[in-house]
Amino acid sequence: KELSRFAGWYGHNKERRFKMEPDFDPVHGADGWQVSNLPILSLAPYLASVEMFAEVGMDKLITKRNLITSYLEFILHEIDKELEGADFEILTPSNQEERGCQLSVYLHGQGRELFDRLMKNGVITDWREPNVIRLAPAPFYCSFEDMYEFGQILKELILNK
């Protein structure tokens, strides 16, 4: 089944493109979604990104993703055991293959207030209703030290409600 889409020059059948016919003859598949020439200058960052991924390799990124997310999970469990005021639960599955590099943490107590205080302390997280903070230790640019520092900041904020 074809979905509605813009009828662009590069989405038109290559064999008929230069015939300049009034009807759109779509290319099937992903190529059919192209509308026009790609703006070359805005693509430069993508090239750098692709080169970085190629240099590091997906296997290494996946390994670090699993290790750093497990470390963050460990830190959260330790805070939960250590502090009486830590009233949260990790919603994301513990199985590494089911979660990628994100942990969704349900906050029973402080909710949005804790999120706002984390942001004021330089911790970039994501807020979702109801009362969920999403933590994403991206393996390309987050370090294990970043996770440790996050844990220290979180403990401090919970202790000083």
Positions of PLM-derived features:
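Short loop segments at secondary-structure junctions
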Residues: 1-3, 107-110
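Short, flexible turn/loop "capping" segments at secondary-structure junctions
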Residues: 42, 95-97, 127-130
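A generic structural signal for alpha-helix starts
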Residues: 41, 56, 60, 109-113, ...
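PLP-dependent enzyme catalytic core of the Aspartate aminotransferase-like
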Residues: 109-110, 117-161
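Conserved small-domain helix->loop->beta segment predominantly found in fold-type I
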Residues: 24, 30-34, 53-106
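Active-site C-terminal subdomain of aminotransferase-like
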Residues: 1-64, 70
